[in-house]
A protein has these predicted regions:
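Inter-domain helical "communication" segments and dimerization helices
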Residues: 1-38, 122-130
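Terminal helix-turn-helix DNA-binding modules in bacterial transcription factors
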Residues: 29-34, 39, 62-100, 123-130
Length: 130
């Protein structure tokens, strides 16, 4: 039995130091989810987690499979889609999800979805009315 208890102690010691970092990364993801409309930067988010920017990027990607910037972009576009379904204007949606440039918003929307926000909105409206 001591072999197993020794092994459990050894593994616990290996995992424990990372537990705090895991909590910080999870908290950062939650922060992004809540504050995506705000002007967020990697420096701000990593600073709130008390982790260097480069270490934060590496850890976030390790835990979530994508960079924090990419995650933020996807959260913004997902929320933009919800607003577009409510027949909001492109200008309104752009500002509501944290973009300061309509051109940047349209470009990123197209990159992620394969279509423009207006075309996406029209397509969903047609499908909704069928």
């Amino acid at each position: 039995m001591t072999f197993y208890s020794d092994e459990i102690k050894r593994i616990t010691k290996l995992i424990a130091p990372h537990d705090d970092l895991t909590k910080k990364i999870v908290a950062s993801k939650i922060f992004i989810d809540k504050h995506y409309p705000d002007d967020l930067s990697l420096d701000l988010i990593a600073g709130k987690a008390h982790i260097s920017k480069f270490h934060f990027i590496r850890l976030f990607k390790k835990y979530y499979g994508q960079t924090p910037n990419r995650y933020l972009q996807e959260v913004r576009i997902a929320n933009a889609k919800k607003l577009l379904l409510k027949d909001k204007t492109i200008d309104h949606v752009c500002a509501a999800v944290g973009f300061t440039s309509k051109t940047s918003f349209i470009s990123l929307f197209r990159k992620i979805t394969g279509t423009t926000p207006l075309a996406w909105q029209r397509k969903k409206a047609i499908l909704k009315n069928k």
